[in-house]
């Protein structure tokens, strides 16, 4: 709920760490289920702080502002309905995952080759000049991180509490800077992470091509028009959920999906007299739901 990328990565790290510790003790754990359980938390990401769809429509100047205005997060991710559903989803995952445990003879433990850890190393010289000492000292990180936090605080003080894409991006940048031990350490972490997401970066041009085809050929319009033809004001949110899950299989990026699907579904909401926030969260729920079978995020 805090950050989809942070949760996805931390979940994988925790699953791996738990499996490694279990391998050192007489305790057998089914590694595929452990990984799947950690990944399943991803199913509620669009309900949280980094929801790209909700943040998109909460950002002044967004693509659809002339039609729906700015939709505050209090109507989307901070609504009582969304918070309740998020907690229910989290509880359901916690209950279901342990029930999927296989028989002891079918347990697959972690591969010993995966236990070898690779951590970014920073080599410090015995004698460093002023610039080198500066880039290996934490003071610059803390200074920059605090400046960003102060800026966010001033923004909240002037405009009240609200979230948009810029605020979320600045928040996580400030946290990354403060938690890193030095500027050079922060850079090394970024470089190391870039190697991890390389397979995702490689896929983006292909999925962008699919997104372009769906947008320019009218395929997205056809799918959405069909949904609208059978939807009512009471069921539009549900059909937005189904269409969001379907389109996500072709456009896995939440922001990219909304750019293609959002305008059409918003027009549907306006024509049926439905609150646009219902469609926004319907598409968001569909996106996060089908991520469980979307291979894009699991390849790394």
Walk through the language-model features, giving the residues of each.
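Hydrophobic transmembrane alpha-helices of multi-pass small-molecule transporters
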Residues: 78-89, 95-203
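Loop-to-transmembrane-helix entry motif
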Residues: 193-197, 201, 230, 286-292, ...
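Hydrophobic alpha-helical transmembrane segments in multi-pass integral membrane proteins
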Residues: 47-48, 204-217, 221, 277-281
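Membrane-core helix-loop-helix motifs of multi-pass transport proteins
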Residues: 14-108, 299-300
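Hydrophobic alpha-helical transmembrane segments of multi-pass integral membrane proteins
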Residues: 1-14, 202-217, 228-267, 271-272
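Alpha-helical transmembrane segments and their immediate interhelical/interface regions
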Residues: 1-20, 156-177, 295-298
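Short amphipathic alpha-helical coupling elements at transmembrane boundaries
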Residues: 20-23, 185-199, 225-229, 266-271
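Alpha-helical transmembrane segments of multi-pass membrane proteins
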Residues: 1, 25-48, 74, 234-249, ...
């Amino acid at each position: 709920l805090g950050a989809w990328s942070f949760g996805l990565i931390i979940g994988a790290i925790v699953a791996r760490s738990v499996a490694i510790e279990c391998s050192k003790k007489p305790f057998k754990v089914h590694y595929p289920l452990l990984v799947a359980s950690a990944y399943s938390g991803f199913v509620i990401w669009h309900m949280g702080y980094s929801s790209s769809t909700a943040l998109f429509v909460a950002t002044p100047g967004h693509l659809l502002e002339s039609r729906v205005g700015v939709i505050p997060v209090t109507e989307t991710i901070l609504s009582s309905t969304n918070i309740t559903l998020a907690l229910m989803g989290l509880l359901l995952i916690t209950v279901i995952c342990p029930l999927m445990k296989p028989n002891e003879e079918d347990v697959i433990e972690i591969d010993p080759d995966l236990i070898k850890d690779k951590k970014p190393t920073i080599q410090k010289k015995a004698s460093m000049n002023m610039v080198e000492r500066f880039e290996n000292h934490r003071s610059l990180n803390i200074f920059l991180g605090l400046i960003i936090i102060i800026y966010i605080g001033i923004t909240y003080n002037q405009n009240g509490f609200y979230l948009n894409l810029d605020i979320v991006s600045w928040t996580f940048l400030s946290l990354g800077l403060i938690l890193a031990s030095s500027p050079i350490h922060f850079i090394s972490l970024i470089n190391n992470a870039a190697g991890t997401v390389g397979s995702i970066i490689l896929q983006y041009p292909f999925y962008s091509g699919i997104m372009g085809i769906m947008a320019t050929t009218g395929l997205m319009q056809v799918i959405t028009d069909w949904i609208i033809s059978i939807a009512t004001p009471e069921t539009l949110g549900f059909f937005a959920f189904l269409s969001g899950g379907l389109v996500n299989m072709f456009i896995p990026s939440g922001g990219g999906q909304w750019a293609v699907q959002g305008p059409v579904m918003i027009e549907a909401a306006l024509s049926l007299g439905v609150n646009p926030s219902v469609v926004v969260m319907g598409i968001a729920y569909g996106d996060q739901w089908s991520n469980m079978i979307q291979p894009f995020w699991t390849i790394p």
